[in-house]
């Protein structure tokens, strides 16, 4: 995997100055009665741990003219050059404002594919006794999905000392050869195009036949909503924390519970903006592939478009319908015919794929709202309850993240389980959704009501 897979390359090129597609893992450490770690102590800790994470020793090298997919190369920068110190002791910052600032600025993966932001001196953080240390691991989506982010968080901050390299299917890094890659891609373009046609056509025909015969269900585009406006580079983040016990006890999973609440909140928001009776709301839910599925890309997730059924007033019926829709879409995206059709692009010439993508990004509208969309929002769900993260004597109070916004998506949701907490991070573009705080309050109420209906649990000791 010295040359990037097309799917990872798409994540790399989708990130732009006005749109970060990076992965963000935010960890809030509580030192209790002890002094919080200094920035130099955090650097020393990460330097010691990062040597056993080969994934953190690579970056990306692009070929001139994009005649070939980028290459994984070794990163010559020392670990300390990847850490950024942020003094948050001025009283103006919160965890939410800190995450909003970071999520609006993508990293340049051709220079450094990851950074660790260390926020020090943040006071009045719920659940933290003293000054909080907020560590945000920002990593290019081209080299990390949610599962990889969990492995990296455990390797860097997990309790106990690692003695072996973190077991990940790491890309093979080589020396940079941009001119060679470009020349080879240009010379081989006609041959690669010719060789790609038969397998691509065959795979696409099988997939489309399955869709036509009703064996696989592909949701048709539906009318867009207010929160489908194209976002600009500004970001706002709301962090909602709940006891894990509030989300358990009933038959619904945390993911289905979150989708049920999000559907109710989105429907309420639509009604407040003159769009009542929306029964077509959908969420994009990243679906992980099992380890047994042959997959050349670093990112082992595919998007599933899940109907939220807001027309069903009863939360139990709505959750059941959502669970069925989620299972149906997971079956769709993991079906061998869909996987074969997706993988068939691997043999297509890089220059043509990247050229089409570059043209699409250049001509795509940066403002306004599309007429129709496949999904209205994003809901990611990551289980990190198995982690026990520490930084010196400080213990992690929470571990969460931010889901990226993109074209036609101005509101996203990231659901994280860690310890005895479930954290829901709402990211929004304040330019296109100026009343994002109202939506966050709607979602909080919807979560309380949904958990009560599905799990028989009352609201208890919500920290934020």
List each language-model region with its residue ranges:
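Hydrophobic/aromatic beta-strand elements that line small-molecule binding cavities or substrate pockets
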Residues: 413
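A cross-kingdom marker of C-terminal helix-rich interaction/assembly modules
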Residues: 437-441
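General N-terminal leader/first-domain-start detector
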Residues: 1-18, 22-24
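Soluble acyl-CoA-dependent acyltransferase catalytic core bearing the H(X)4D motif
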Residues: 1-6, 26-37, 47-51, 58-407, ...
């Amino acid at each position: 995997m010295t040359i990037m897979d097309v799917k990872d390359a798409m994540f790399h090129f989708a990130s732009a100055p006005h749109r970060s597609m990076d992965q963000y893992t935010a960890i809030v450490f509580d030192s209790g009665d002890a002094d919080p770690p200094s920035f130099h102590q955090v650097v020393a800790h990460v330097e010691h741990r990062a040597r056993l994470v080969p994934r953190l020793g690579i970056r990306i090298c692009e070929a001139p003219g994009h005649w070939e997919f980028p290459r994984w190369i070794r990163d010559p920068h020392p670990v300390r050059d990847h850490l950024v110190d942020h003094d948050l002791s001025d009283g103006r910052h919160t965890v939410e404002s800190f995450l909003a600032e970071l999520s609006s600025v993508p990293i340049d993966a051709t220079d450094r594919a990851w950074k660790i932001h260390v926020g020090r001196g943040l006071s009045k953080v719920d659940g933290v006794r003293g000054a909080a240390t907020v560590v945000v691991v920002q990593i290019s989506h081209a080299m990390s999905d949610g599962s990889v982010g969990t492995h990296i968080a455990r390797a860097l901050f997990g309790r106990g000392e690692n003695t072996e390299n973190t077991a990940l299917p790491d890309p093979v890094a080589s020396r940079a050869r941009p001119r060679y890659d470009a020349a080879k891609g240009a010379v081989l373009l006609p041959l690669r195009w010719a060789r790609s046609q038969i397998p691509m056509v065959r795979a696409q025909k099988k997939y489309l036949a399955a869709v036509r015969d009703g064996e696989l269900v592909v949701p048709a585009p539906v009318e867009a909503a207010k929160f489908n406006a194209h976002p600009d580079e500004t970001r706002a983040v709301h962090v909602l924390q709940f006891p894990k016990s509030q989300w358990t006890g009933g038959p619904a999973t945390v993911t289905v519970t979150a989708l049920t609440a999000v559907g109710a909140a989105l429907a309420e928001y639509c009604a407040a903006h003159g769009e009542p009776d929306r029964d077509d709301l959908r969420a994009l839910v990243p679906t992980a592939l099992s380890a047994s599925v042959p997959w050349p890309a670093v990112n082992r997730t595919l998007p599933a478009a899940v109907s939220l059924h807001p027309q069903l007033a009863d939360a139990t019926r709505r959750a059941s319908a959502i669970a069925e829709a989620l299972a149906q879409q997971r079956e769709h995206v993991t079906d061998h015919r869909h996987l074969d059709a997706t993988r068939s692009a691997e043999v297509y010439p890089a220059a043509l794929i990247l050229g089409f993508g570059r043209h699409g990004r250049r001509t795509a509208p940066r403002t306004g709202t599309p007429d129709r969309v496949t999904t209205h929002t994003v809901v990611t769900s990551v289980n990190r309850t198995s982690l026990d993260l520490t930084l010196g004597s400080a213990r992690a109070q929470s571990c969460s993240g931010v889901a990226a916004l993109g074209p036609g998506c101005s509101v996203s949701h990231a659901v994280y389980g860690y310890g005895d907490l479930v954290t829901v991070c709402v990211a929004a573009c304040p330019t296109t959704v100026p009343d994002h705080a109202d939506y966050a309050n709607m979602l909080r109420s919807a979560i309380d009501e949904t958990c009560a209906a599905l799990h028989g649990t009352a609201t208890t000791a919500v920290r934020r």
